[in-house]
Design a protein with these regions (language model features):
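Substrate-binding cleft of secreted/luminal carbohydrate-active enzymes
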Residues: 2-47, 275, 283-287
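Phosphate-group recognition and catalysis centered on beta-loop-alpha active-site segments
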Residues: 45-301
């Protein structure tokens, strides 16, 4: 019966506590239960990997069995998926620290008066961030009622936390503006004594090249765009690749390339437990997620 076939699949899956795709059986039309190495369809492995991760994620979440994990979690724009918090707020930083994540990602723009401020989008409440002075921007409210923070305020709060800081410097209107922003940010991070606790990321290759020039030696520098080969990023002086989940799926050799180059890997923005498990299984170094609480539930006792 179909029930017996499904039971055979589940029994085989649970027998292998750590997921091993080559050992998973599945039902294929009237052909009964097959193992993946018997399939003549090249898409079967990817399909079964997806299904098995879904089942395994539910099992871990339901029974509280932690996964074996070396992947570190970064809270995307802080831990804002909780009461009293908001994206890129100081509360989201403090709540992420209380949650026990490895790192907190946040977004930085340079206001028109040269003051770095935190915001994701280029506009907030009708004001273009890089064309507006910080004296105006800091009167604007976030969703939790906090004013838009300056980078100085954020770093001051971060001094009393243990989290690693993942600073995304947003692309600006001109290369000159990007250089000025990179110089201001690196200088400010150094002034607060946090240089060893900061990773810099950006979608702008110009910004990343400037950060490679400006940041202290051994600073983690990771590019967010997916259109440049890892080896070319390393040649620019970058130390890691911070790619969207889809980029890794579309370029299946890149993770191994990154490891061979002795670069760090990060995947974003992964909120689905099955996709989180993909990152863990593939030994991605860092995962950026809006649900760090869910990731920790998967991986902690």
């Amino acid at each position: 019966s179909s029930h017996d076939r499904m039971a055979a699949y589940i029994n085989h899956f649970e027998k292998n506590d750590v997921f091993n795709s080559s050992a998973v059986a599945y039902y294929c039309g009237n052909r009964g239960v097959l193992t993946l190495d018997e399939s003549d369809n090249p898409k079967d492995k990817a399909l079964m990997d997806r299904l098995a991760r879904i089942i395994q994620a539910r099992r871990y979440l339901k029974y509280g069995i932690p996964m074996k994990n070396k992947t570190r979690v970064v809270a995307h724009r802080g831990f804002w998926h909780t009461d009293g918090s908001a994206q890129n707020s100081i509360a989201s930083l403090l709540k992420a620290d209380q949650l026990g994540v490895y790192g907190v990602e946040f977004d930085v723009w340079m206001a028109s008066d040269g003051v770095p401020v935190l915001n994701h989008d280029g506009w907030h409440d009708g004001y273009e961030v890089q064309s507006t002075p910080s004296t105006v921007l800091t009167t604007l409210k976030l969703e939790n009622g906090e004013p838009m923070p300056t980078l100085a305020q954020y770093l001051e709060a971060a001094k009393d936390t243990k989290v690693h800081l993942v600073l995304e410097l947003k692309p600006h209107a001109t290369p000159e503006a990007e250089t000025a922003a990179a110089e201001a940010v690196v200088k400010m991070v150094g002034r607060y004594g946090l240089s060893k606790r900061v990773t810099y990321i950006s979608f702008s290759l110009h910004i990343m090249k400037e950060l490679a020039r400006l940041a202290p030696a051994k600073t983690q520098l990771m590019y967010l765009g997916g259109g440049t080969l890892p080896k070319d990023l390393k040649a620019m002086g970058l130390t890691g690749c911070d790619f969207n989940y889809g980029v890794y799926l579309n370029n299946p050799t890149w993770l191994n390339d990154i490891k061979a180059l002795k670069m760090a890997s990060n995947v974003w923005t992964v909120n689905n437990p099955a996709d989180m498990m993909w990152a863990i299984e593939n030994r991605v170094d860092y995962i950026t997620t809006d649900r760090p609480d869910l990731f920790l539930k998967l991986t902690r006792k």
